[in-house]
Amino acid sequence: MNKAKIMLKNYTHHNTESSLTKTIVFADLDDTLFRSYRKLTSDFQNNGINTDISTLPVGAYNKKNLPEKNSHLEPFRMKMVDWIVGKADLFIPTTMRTLQQFDRINFKLFNFTNLKYIITDNGKYIHIINKTTGTVGNSVTDRNTSQEDKNKYEMLSDWANMMNTGFFDNPNNPSLSDTALFIKEQSKQNKMFHNDCFTVFNTEQLINYKNDWESTLLHSFFKNIQFNPNENIVLNGYIDGKVTNNDIIPQEVHDYMFELGFYIYQSYDRIAFVPYYQRKEYAVYYLMKMLNINSYYDLVIGLGDNDIDVNFMNLCSFAMIPQNSNLLK
Protein backbone atom coordinates (compact mmCIF):
# COMPACT_ATOMS: atom_id res chain seq x y z
CA MET A 1 0.00 0.00 0.00
CA ASN A 2 1.60 3.24 -1.07
CA LYS A 3 1.36 6.51 0.82
CA ALA A 4 -1.27 7.94 -1.52
CA LYS A 5 -3.58 5.01 -0.80
CA ILE A 6 -2.96 5.31 2.93
CA MET A 7 -3.82 9.02 2.90
CA LEU A 8 -6.92 8.45 0.75
CA LYS A 9 -8.07 5.83 3.21
CA ASN A 10 -7.50 8.25 6.05
CA TYR A 11 -9.58 10.99 4.40
CA THR A 12 -12.60 8.70 4.30
CA HIS A 13 -12.55 8.02 8.04
CA HIS A 14 -11.47 11.41 9.33
CA ASN A 15 -13.66 13.15 11.87
CA THR A 16 -13.29 16.87 11.23
CA GLU A 17 -14.94 17.57 14.60
CA SER A 18 -12.05 15.97 16.51
CA SER A 19 -10.69 18.24 19.23
CA LEU A 20 -7.78 15.96 20.12
CA THR A 21 -5.81 15.93 16.91
CA LYS A 22 -4.56 19.32 15.77
CA THR A 23 -0.77 19.43 15.85
CA ILE A 24 0.84 16.07 16.56
CA VAL A 25 4.56 15.32 16.83
CA PHE A 26 6.01 11.82 16.55
CA ALA A 27 9.69 12.11 17.49
CA ASP A 28 12.67 9.85 17.82
CA LEU A 29 14.75 10.83 20.86
CA ASP A 30 18.44 9.84 20.73
CA ASP A 31 20.39 11.84 18.13
CA THR A 32 17.18 13.70 17.28
CA LEU A 33 16.11 15.68 20.36
CA PHE A 34 19.36 15.11 22.29
CA ARG A 35 22.83 13.64 21.70
CA SER A 36 25.32 11.74 23.81
CA TYR A 37 28.27 13.49 25.44
CA ARG A 38 30.63 11.38 23.33
CA LYS A 39 29.02 12.27 20.00
CA LEU A 40 28.85 15.95 20.89
CA THR A 41 32.53 15.90 21.85
CA SER A 42 33.44 14.50 18.45
CA ASP A 43 31.21 16.97 16.56
CA PHE A 44 32.47 19.97 18.52
CA GLN A 45 36.09 19.02 17.89
CA ASN A 46 35.47 18.51 14.16
CA ASN A 47 33.63 21.83 13.82
CA GLY A 48 35.77 24.00 16.08
CA ILE A 49 33.02 24.58 18.65
CA ASN A 50 34.42 25.49 22.07
CA THR A 51 31.24 25.12 24.13
CA ASP A 52 31.62 23.22 27.40
CA ILE A 53 29.22 20.31 26.89
CA SER A 54 28.61 19.95 30.61
CA THR A 55 26.95 23.39 30.59
CA LEU A 56 24.35 22.32 28.02
CA PRO A 57 20.91 21.16 29.23
CA VAL A 58 20.77 17.46 30.06
CA GLY A 59 18.32 15.55 27.89
CA ALA A 60 18.75 12.09 29.40
CA TYR A 61 20.70 10.58 32.27
CA ASN A 62 22.65 7.33 32.21
CA LYS A 63 21.97 4.43 34.54
CA LYS A 64 25.40 4.68 36.19
CA ASN A 65 24.95 8.35 37.11
CA LEU A 66 28.15 9.36 35.30
CA PRO A 67 28.04 12.95 33.96
CA GLU A 68 30.21 12.08 30.94
CA LYS A 69 27.64 9.46 29.92
CA ASN A 70 24.66 11.83 29.88
CA SER A 71 22.98 13.17 26.74
CA HIS A 72 22.62 16.91 26.10
CA LEU A 73 20.82 19.42 23.89
CA GLU A 74 22.49 22.09 21.80
CA PRO A 75 20.60 25.42 21.65
CA PHE A 76 18.75 24.59 18.42
CA ARG A 77 17.49 21.29 19.86
CA MET A 78 16.41 23.07 23.02
CA LYS A 79 14.37 25.50 20.91
CA MET A 80 12.73 22.56 19.16
CA VAL A 81 11.80 20.99 22.50
CA ASP A 82 10.41 24.33 23.71
CA TRP A 83 8.31 24.56 20.54
CA ILE A 84 6.95 21.03 20.99
CA VAL A 85 6.11 21.72 24.64
CA GLY A 86 4.37 24.99 23.80
CA LYS A 87 2.70 24.33 20.46
CA ALA A 88 1.97 20.63 19.93
CA ASP A 89 -1.39 19.27 21.04
CA LEU A 90 0.09 15.80 21.27
CA PHE A 91 3.71 14.70 21.58
CA ILE A 92 4.41 10.99 21.05
CA PRO A 93 8.01 9.83 21.62
CA THR A 94 8.82 7.13 19.07
CA THR A 95 11.97 5.49 20.27
CA MET A 96 14.12 2.39 20.33
CA ARG A 97 14.56 2.93 24.07
CA THR A 98 12.92 0.55 26.48
CA LEU A 99 10.46 2.02 28.99
CA GLN A 100 13.14 1.87 31.69
CA GLN A 101 15.55 3.77 29.44
CA PHE A 102 12.83 6.24 28.53
CA ASP A 103 12.31 6.96 32.22
CA ARG A 104 15.87 8.30 32.44
CA ILE A 105 14.92 11.34 30.35
CA ASN A 106 15.21 14.66 32.19
CA PHE A 107 11.51 15.35 32.70
CA LYS A 108 12.22 18.59 34.54
CA LEU A 109 13.39 19.85 31.15
CA PHE A 110 10.97 17.85 29.01
CA ASN A 111 7.90 19.12 30.85
CA PHE A 112 5.43 17.75 28.34
CA THR A 113 1.84 18.32 29.40
CA ASN A 114 0.92 17.02 25.94
CA LEU A 115 2.58 13.62 26.55
CA LYS A 116 -0.11 10.93 26.58
CA TYR A 117 1.43 8.04 24.60
CA ILE A 118 4.91 6.56 24.22
CA ILE A 119 6.12 4.16 21.53
CA THR A 120 9.10 2.17 22.87
CA ASP A 121 11.31 -0.77 21.87
CA ASN A 122 11.23 0.29 18.21
CA GLY A 123 7.47 -0.15 18.01
CA LYS A 124 6.95 -3.28 20.09
CA TYR A 125 5.11 -1.47 22.87
CA ILE A 126 2.72 1.47 23.07
CA HIS A 127 2.24 2.92 26.55
CA ILE A 128 -0.46 5.24 27.87
CA ILE A 129 0.53 7.82 30.47
CA ASN A 130 -1.58 7.52 33.61
CA LYS A 131 -1.77 11.13 34.76
CA THR A 132 -3.48 10.24 38.04
CA THR A 133 -0.31 8.76 39.56
CA GLY A 134 1.80 11.91 39.35
CA THR A 135 4.45 13.22 36.98
CA VAL A 136 6.10 11.08 34.34
CA GLY A 137 9.71 10.06 34.80
CA ASN A 138 11.92 9.68 37.84
CA SER A 139 13.83 12.40 39.67
CA VAL A 140 17.49 13.10 39.00
CA THR A 141 18.60 11.79 42.38
CA ASP A 142 16.36 8.74 42.61
CA ARG A 143 15.74 6.97 39.33
CA ASN A 144 14.95 3.53 40.76
CA THR A 145 11.58 2.47 39.41
CA SER A 146 9.07 2.10 42.26
CA GLN A 147 5.65 0.46 42.05
CA GLU A 148 4.11 3.92 41.77
CA ASP A 149 6.47 4.68 38.87
CA LYS A 150 5.39 1.49 37.11
CA ASN A 151 1.73 2.43 37.55
CA LYS A 152 2.34 5.65 35.63
CA TYR A 153 2.39 3.65 32.41
CA GLU A 154 -0.39 1.48 31.07
CA MET A 155 0.44 -0.77 28.15
CA LEU A 156 -1.92 -0.91 25.17
CA SER A 157 -2.76 -4.58 25.64
CA ASP A 158 -4.20 -5.27 22.17
CA TRP A 159 -1.05 -3.99 20.52
CA ALA A 160 1.23 -5.87 22.93
CA ASN A 161 -0.71 -9.09 22.34
CA MET A 162 -0.33 -8.74 18.59
CA MET A 163 3.40 -8.18 18.95
CA ASN A 164 3.89 -11.02 21.44
CA THR A 165 1.51 -13.73 20.25
CA GLY A 166 1.52 -13.03 16.53
CA PHE A 167 -2.22 -12.98 15.79
CA PHE A 168 -3.20 -10.44 13.16
CA ASP A 169 -6.96 -10.51 13.32
CA ASN A 170 -8.97 -8.93 16.11
CA PRO A 171 -12.55 -8.33 14.98
CA ASN A 172 -13.28 -6.27 18.11
CA ASN A 173 -10.59 -3.73 17.27
CA PRO A 174 -10.99 -2.24 13.77
CA SER A 175 -7.87 -0.07 14.17
CA LEU A 176 -5.81 -3.18 14.93
CA SER A 177 -7.28 -5.10 11.99
CA ASP A 178 -6.62 -2.18 9.67
CA THR A 179 -3.03 -1.97 10.92
CA ALA A 180 -2.59 -5.70 10.36
CA LEU A 181 -3.63 -5.20 6.74
CA PHE A 182 -1.18 -2.31 6.45
CA ILE A 183 1.64 -4.48 7.83
CA LYS A 184 0.87 -7.28 5.41
CA GLU A 185 0.78 -4.87 2.48
CA GLN A 186 4.12 -3.42 3.53
CA SER A 187 5.67 -6.86 4.03
CA LYS A 188 4.67 -8.83 0.95
CA GLN A 189 8.26 -9.89 0.26
CA ASN A 190 8.89 -11.06 3.81
CA LYS A 191 8.60 -14.79 4.43
CA MET A 192 7.63 -14.18 8.05
CA PHE A 193 4.11 -13.13 7.09
CA HIS A 194 1.74 -15.90 6.04
CA ASN A 195 -1.77 -17.19 6.71
CA ASP A 196 -2.85 -13.89 8.25
CA CYS A 197 -0.49 -14.42 11.19
CA PHE A 198 2.92 -13.31 12.32
CA THR A 199 5.49 -16.04 12.52
CA VAL A 200 6.07 -16.25 16.26
CA PHE A 201 9.81 -15.71 16.32
CA ASN A 202 11.97 -16.97 19.15
CA THR A 203 14.71 -14.40 19.61
CA GLU A 204 16.70 -16.91 21.67
CA GLN A 205 17.42 -18.60 18.35
CA LEU A 206 19.83 -15.86 17.40
CA ILE A 207 21.68 -16.22 20.70
CA ASN A 208 22.24 -19.89 19.92
CA TYR A 209 23.50 -19.00 16.47
CA LYS A 210 25.94 -16.32 17.48
CA ASN A 211 28.63 -18.78 18.62
CA ASP A 212 28.15 -21.18 15.74
CA TRP A 213 28.24 -19.22 12.49
CA GLU A 214 28.08 -21.08 9.22
CA SER A 215 30.88 -19.37 7.34
CA THR A 216 34.11 -17.47 7.80
CA LEU A 217 32.44 -14.28 6.58
CA LEU A 218 29.72 -14.43 9.22
CA HIS A 219 32.17 -15.37 11.94
CA SER A 220 34.55 -12.54 11.03
CA PHE A 221 31.66 -10.08 11.30
CA PHE A 222 30.03 -11.30 14.48
CA LYS A 223 33.27 -11.80 16.39
CA ASN A 224 33.56 -7.98 16.40
CA ILE A 225 30.25 -7.55 18.23
CA GLN A 226 30.03 -7.34 22.01
CA PHE A 227 26.64 -8.60 23.18
CA ASN A 228 25.19 -7.66 26.54
CA PRO A 229 24.70 -10.93 28.46
CA ASN A 230 22.35 -9.27 30.96
CA GLU A 231 19.94 -7.88 28.39
CA ASN A 232 16.31 -8.98 28.64
CA ILE A 233 15.88 -10.08 25.04
CA VAL A 234 12.42 -11.52 25.52
CA LEU A 235 11.19 -8.22 26.99
CA ASN A 236 12.90 -5.91 24.49
CA GLY A 237 12.23 -8.13 21.52
CA TYR A 238 15.55 -7.33 19.88
CA ILE A 239 19.22 -8.08 20.46
CA ASP A 240 21.56 -5.21 21.21
CA GLY A 241 25.33 -5.02 20.94
CA LYS A 242 28.34 -2.86 20.17
CA VAL A 243 30.68 -3.20 17.21
CA THR A 244 34.42 -2.85 17.72
CA ASN A 245 35.12 -1.59 14.20
CA ASN A 246 33.40 0.61 11.62
CA ASP A 247 33.39 -1.83 8.72
CA ILE A 248 30.39 -1.80 6.39
CA ILE A 249 28.05 -4.70 7.08
CA PRO A 250 28.41 -7.23 4.22
CA GLN A 251 25.24 -7.88 2.21
CA GLU A 252 25.62 -11.58 2.99
CA VAL A 253 25.12 -10.77 6.67
CA HIS A 254 21.95 -8.80 5.90
CA ASP A 255 20.70 -11.74 3.81
CA TYR A 256 21.51 -14.24 6.55
CA MET A 257 19.71 -12.20 9.19
CA PHE A 258 16.74 -11.77 6.85
CA GLU A 259 16.42 -15.55 6.66
CA LEU A 260 16.33 -15.62 10.47
CA GLY A 261 13.66 -12.91 10.45
CA PHE A 262 15.75 -9.91 11.53
CA TYR A 263 16.77 -6.60 10.05
CA ILE A 264 19.94 -4.84 11.20
CA TYR A 265 20.00 -1.41 12.79
CA GLN A 266 23.34 0.34 13.19
CA SER A 267 24.18 3.78 14.58
CA TYR A 268 27.84 4.52 15.17
CA ASP A 269 29.10 1.67 17.40
CA ARG A 270 25.66 0.42 18.35
CA ILE A 271 24.11 -2.48 16.48
CA ALA A 272 20.79 -4.21 16.97
CA PHE A 273 19.07 -7.18 15.37
CA VAL A 274 15.34 -6.49 15.30
CA PRO A 275 12.49 -8.81 14.24
CA TYR A 276 11.00 -7.67 10.95
CA TYR A 277 7.54 -7.10 12.41
CA GLN A 278 8.90 -4.77 15.12
CA ARG A 279 8.93 -1.37 13.41
CA LYS A 280 8.13 2.16 14.48
CA GLU A 281 5.89 2.85 11.49
CA TYR A 282 3.52 0.02 12.41
CA ALA A 283 2.96 1.44 15.90
CA VAL A 284 2.61 4.98 14.50
CA TYR A 285 0.08 3.82 11.93
CA TYR A 286 -1.95 2.06 14.63
CA LEU A 287 -1.99 5.13 16.89
CA MET A 288 -2.98 7.36 13.98
CA LYS A 289 -5.92 5.06 13.29
CA MET A 290 -6.88 4.72 16.94
CA LEU A 291 -6.71 8.47 17.62
CA ASN A 292 -8.21 9.46 14.26
CA ILE A 293 -5.10 11.40 13.27
CA ASN A 294 -4.97 12.38 9.63
CA SER A 295 -1.85 13.73 7.95
CA TYR A 296 -3.92 15.79 5.49
CA TYR A 297 -6.28 17.64 7.83
CA ASP A 298 -3.98 17.65 10.86
CA LEU A 299 -0.43 18.94 11.13
CA VAL A 300 1.51 15.75 11.82
CA ILE A 301 5.28 16.16 12.17
CA GLY A 302 7.75 13.27 12.21
CA LEU A 303 11.26 13.84 13.58
CA GLY A 304 14.04 11.31 13.12
CA ASP A 305 17.67 10.85 12.24
CA ASN A 306 18.10 7.26 11.03
CA ASP A 307 16.95 4.85 8.35
CA ILE A 308 14.60 3.15 10.80
CA ASP A 309 12.78 6.48 11.26
CA VAL A 310 12.10 7.19 7.59
CA ASN A 311 8.99 5.05 7.19
CA PHE A 312 7.15 6.47 10.19
CA MET A 313 8.16 9.98 9.10
CA ASN A 314 6.62 9.24 5.69
CA LEU A 315 3.25 8.75 7.39
CA CYS A 316 3.37 12.35 8.65
CA SER A 317 2.54 15.66 6.98
CA PHE A 318 6.13 16.87 7.39
CA ALA A 319 9.37 14.99 8.01
CA MET A 320 12.13 16.82 9.90
CA ILE A 321 15.79 15.78 10.13
CA PRO A 322 18.33 17.38 12.49
CA GLN A 323 21.81 18.39 11.37
CA ASN A 324 24.53 15.73 11.80
CA SER A 325 21.92 13.09 11.03
CA ASN A 326 22.91 9.76 9.51
CA LEU A 327 20.31 10.49 6.84
CA LEU A 328 22.32 13.49 5.65
CA LYS A 329 25.64 11.66 5.31
List the model feature ranges, each with a label.
Residues 27-39, 121-123, 129-131, 230, ...:
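Short loop/turn segments at strand-loop or loop-helix junctions that form parts
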Residues 6-11, 15-93:
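Active-site neighborhood of HAD-like aspartate-dependent phosphohydrolases
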Residues 195-301, 306-315:
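Conserved acidic, metal-coordinating active-site core of Asp-based
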Residues 70-218:
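Active-site phosphate-binding/coordination module
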